[in-house]
Design a protein with these regions (language model features):
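Catalytic core of DAGKc-family lipid kinases
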Residues: 41, 80-197
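Glycine-rich beta-strand-to-loop/alpha-helix junction loops that act as flexible
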Residues: 9, 65-67, 90-92
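Short glycine-/acidic-enriched loop or helix-start segments at secondary-structure transitions
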Residues: 16, 73-75, 99-100, 207-208
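Glycine-rich phosphate/pyrophosphate-binding beta-alpha loops
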Residues: 138, 142, 197-212
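ATP/NTP phosphate-donor binding region
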Residues: 1-62
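Hydrophobic packing residues within well-ordered alpha-helices of enzyme cores
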Residues: 23, 47, 74, 98-99, ...
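Short, glycine/serine-rich, charged loops/turns that create anion-binding
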Residues: 10-11, 94, 202-203
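Short Gly/Thr/Asp-enriched flexible loops that form oxyanion-binding sites at enzyme active sites
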Residues: 70-82
Length: 212
């Protein structure tokens, strides 16, 4: 089998990226994967653009290495490519909500075993404009915090970086209000809210048990 690793070298604390050779070695030595290509992203939407160029049967599967943002990019690109190539996720971000929800392995041996079994499943994906989201779409209070936390803060503090910045933002967020118009099938209503979320899993922002 042939696979492509699309790796975000800036995700999370960079710990997984430093040990990526161990994951690749396990696949080569203990599965029927005999060809592995790697692609390191260089900036925003680079993973999307690489995945969008894929063609049917070019690879047997793709491995996305990064956090939730990287996963969303690559899924969007795969959908645009219409290649229907299966995607494996190697969580290497700060929070990794979607991988946690799916209970995906994060050690070389467990990841190897998952690939060896090669059991695929279909998942839903949400769309907003021309981008998809695998885990959550949100707006309102703290919804932009993922864009405000710097790479240096994530590397230094891990998930705690989001809470630190959240506390800093709290005073300006308290008075926030959105007027929402919601239409789903035959249901239509309006509501004022400080925050809204459309979730595809029960794990959001590092918190388990959020009802999708």
């Amino acid at each position: 089998m042939k696979c492509l690793f699309i790796i975000n070298p800036s995700s999370g604390t960079h710990a997984f990226q430093k040990s990526i050779d161990q994951f690749i070695g396990q696949l080569i030595l203990h599965t029927n994967v005999n060809t592995i290509d790697t692609y390191f992203t260089r900036g925003k939407n680079d993973g999307l653009e690489r995945a969008a160029k894929l063609t049917k049967n070019e690879y047997d599967f793709i491995v996305a290495v990064g956090g939730d943002g990287t996963i969303n990019e690559i899924i969007t690109g795969l959908i645009k490519s219409e290649s229907k190539i299966p995607l494996a996720i190697l969580a290497a971000g700060t929070v990794n909500d979607f991988a946690t929800y799916l209970n995906l392995p994060n050690t070389p041996e467990a990841f190897r075993d998952m690939i060896a079994r090669f059991k695929t499943k279909k998942i839903d994906a949400g769309y907003v404009d021309d981008h998809c989201f695998a885990n959550v779409l949100s707006g309102g209070m703290f919804s932009d915090i993922g864009f405000l936390v710097t790479k240096e803060e994530k590397k230094k503090f891990g998930p705690l970086a989001y809470y630190i910045n959240g506390l800093k933002m709290l005073p300006e967020q308290l008075g926030l209000s959105l007027h929402l118009k919601i239409k789903a099938d035959e249901i239509e209503f309006e509501e004022d809210a400080a925050l809204f979320m459309i979730t595809n899993s029960s794990h959001v922002g590092g918190f388990p048990g959020v009802t999708p």
